[in-house]
């Protein structure tokens, strides 16, 4: 018995020993490889699982549930996923969800880690330029799907949303920049108790209310998926006001960042919020942020990291770190290395606060000059970027390849394995090529490094750093290297196949002992690939115990002791490098240990920003001292220091620094000397004799600076520059003779100063510095030709027109092109007159489109031909062979060429796409047999205004203005006999900022002008874009309160009594316009009241504040004027006579004050301010004579900034406020404020509000409503002309236009409409109402069947056509029956006296039956024809699905400006009759 027990025990011991021996193996286990036929495009693990998804380039989706050992193809329930997965996305905040997007509108979602997939349908291709999926940070069931439709640079994004994992999908809205959730990250607003308020909030970048171009984009939000308010609420990004030009938004941990860019600058404004409500503009310590020139980097929980491009040519930047609310950024390190895709060599060490690895450029000056390649060096910071130091290996500097040379998936250097960091690099002076580098490793978070293995490798960490693997990353390999002691000792294991490795990866938390290695069997990495699964589970026989771990400090200070960051030290319990065990805690992340520190200065930040010396904080606004303090300026009071403890900082206050305590401040700090109510004057006497021209470098709304820069060219050709609006002047190019100045029209910080030779100068920093440049030839000698042309998109792409062969007698102009900064000038075309870039955002595939006028046969005696090219004239196309000139305006190119059949006459042609031209069809009532000149006036409202010279007799020039349709080809007469001068300029001006308002001067005595009688001019105004014109109503009193010597009728101007204004042809400076784009509704002018425009000596000065409907006399005599602060201040000064005073108004011209700016009288040549009229500074250009100087050129700066104490407060949601009211432009003949089918609303400062607008851009508050159509929404069609009653009639003797022309142009068109004489104004958005352009539709030839199918009544329609009249008849009969009460005319005051029924009571059959029959018969007889007609007309065109022509979207979304011609249902006349509005309809017809 004892023997048996001994034998049993012995066997058990042997079995146990044998089992332990099997547990420890000498090498990792490699599963049989899996071969796939196509290259993987992406791969990811579901976090905390062994489940892996892999997408291949052929559209297959593979799944592994055992960390890559085995794989299966995911086919879906019906096999639809096979070969149809375009891309896969993992939910970043839910480890159970993933999404597979298909190319054909069918997509799939899994909520159980790819065990099952549910399909959903969205008929959109996933967005490429925007995120196709946007995830909610708080509710993983909420996802936004985005598809896009692009034409050139412009895209329409359609965003769909789900709140139930795509079980249901709804359209969120259309936009231009996509949509995003407010809660875009789990950390967003998590401590602010806003969960309920913002849980459903979404932001969308949508088109501007008026202009569908990027510079007008808006950021709107909705808390109900845009159901209650389809337009959404505009986000107040800057000081409680909306901002235009929003490009995109991004969620970065606890921040949301929005980027905006204005027209005319590349500078971006970044706005940041931490609560989705309050936004602030981020400041970058004086640095500019430009589009595609900043990168949002991996950020912390308490700050943003941004790298800003500073050198576009060479790819270098500056690294910035923000304060805790993301508003003020501090520069960390200069010359960071970037690539052309915006990737930055920057990475935070995973799991450890405050350690950052960056690469910088050692030789920035040489690289910038183009004389050397980058020398890249690596730097590391252990204090969150405050200081950086070199990486060290064996006493030498170490440099590592980083993000710009990414060779594997995942992070570059680190993983969640505490303290372990690896990289490919070399020691020495700078970084070498990748192939020359080795693998280095650090196990103390980058403090010290050692070489691990020679040659570059792909690498990965496992088991919290207990295992490190590396696969050589050059050529074919057949082995894997691994280390179990933090890279000190290495071993290897053979692979079955030789591969070119493409991926080495493991679980995201690096806690697994399993790895995946993917490689290609071909060097090209196309075709067949192999997947290996490597398992290290058997290499150690035991799991680590407590003694195998060490308490490892994550950060050390310069003395080698644990360092504090954000108020605490950080430690990890980490496996010792030599421990003979595995951690084997799969999917359990290492947990940091924190120990609090006492507060130091590093735990505080400035609430706004630091002082220049970095030792204190700037207080953003004047301090308010406590009540009773500051009785004297030299007194002191206790006020804020400007410091605050960084939010989230856990330092111990007791015994530590206390920078945020109040400090003693001088009462001088509490005063604001600039707002003392006074106007300030600064006189500057200049050495120049006079000015020849001056140029403002307008600062755009997204620009960060505040300078007001002017470049002035003196009469001696010397340049003067001021950055403070003339308070001080400097001469940066003293001694240089500058003959021309060109401002870059698409980049307002850039200007070019030319000489008469090849030498020139340019500035890109608003005149602070000027750099010389060499032109390929001297400027063209033709003073009427422009020397420089600029590309609208590529700001460094230029065309230069220069004089060539001028010493040989064959002086002509050649064009040269510079294709980018740093590029050389290249010849473009010889013997040219003008060359221009024709790239436009609304013109697809036009990036390289160039137009040039070239003399035929390269001879100045040849005809001038117009050429176009897409490849800089390697090839070209002749557009016209005999042109006079061409002009580009808005979306149109208009060409004037000679008629082949009559060379003495011109013909106009128009193109929208820049490829095809159509000959302009002039209206027959414009009889100009020999067309000698055109003037293109304006085309901002989707139509061209063209002046055709009818008389070119000297002193008697005039002609009609005609207006085009939306493609610029068919014209109608807008107004006749408009004044022109000998240079071709026309008395026509659009009121800036107001749709459809324009002013002209017409020649009223045309018959006499041909007899050499001087022209008599009358001023007329239109409020509906030239469809109707009226005389200007005069003021009731003149400036002295006296009546004018004439009278008006019903407040309207008459031929004998109206206001007439001196116009464009009489201006010294074309910039002196009536109106301002920022002072909406205000216009000023000089003129007189009477029967025609009198001479300048009889002129007075007038103002209107309602867009020209009513006018007021301001001053007797002629004055020059300028608007400031968007119209809240207006300054006028006498023209052409000595003065020492100006007059100004602070209430839109209601009252005027006088201000003396000089002790002696001076003669003012001009008054100016910034072109946007948003400054509080004005500049008087004068000639001064006093006891000290005689007739000296001088400037006076008049500064109003101290007059008012504060900026105005605006609440966009309320509209009206204490400082603002909502103003709507009106039409003098309409009561509903509708212009172009909608009413607009603007914020205007109340004249009584004592505050400043401080807004650089005029802002539409809203498009109030789309109105019903009226006569004002129509203009006369081709071959029709307006009559005296406002109607349109066919021109006598002319046929109606061929309505069937549309059928010939488009074979797919089913129907055409008989002409009515009217057409819709191109920009109107009206809906319903008066339908003047469509009455009768007819089928196109051979389209009768399709026409019947489209308009025929269905069985259901026929049923209702029969039943409805009968039902109406029955209802009418019952009504008569129920209301009859026995006697006609009976009035009952109480109950009937008796209860017996009379023969004629209402219940008597003698009454009920006849009445029912009669009423029914009458109702049927009346209703049936009307209803049948209504149904027929309704089916035959008043409800239309399309008109058989291409639908061009003139606006960016369906919601705003949706209406187009013929897209809306109208109520027909007979339906109006049924509704009882016959009389109203007749009245409206009479008016029409």
Swiss-Prot record:
SUPFAM superfamilies, alphabetized: Oligoxyloglucan reducing end-specific cellobiohydrolase (SSF110296), Sialidases (SSF50939)
Disulfide partners: none
Ranges in the topological domain labelled Cytoplasmic: 1373-1405
GO biological process, one term: Golgi to vacuole transport
Annotated glycan sites: 301, 325, 481, 845, 967, 1266
Topological relation to the membrane, as annotated: Multi-pass membrane protein
Descriptive protein name: Vacuolar protein sorting/targeting protein 10
Biological source species: Aspergillus flavus (strain ATCC 200026 / FGSC A1120 / IAM 13836 / NRRL 3357 / JCM 12722 / SRRC 167)
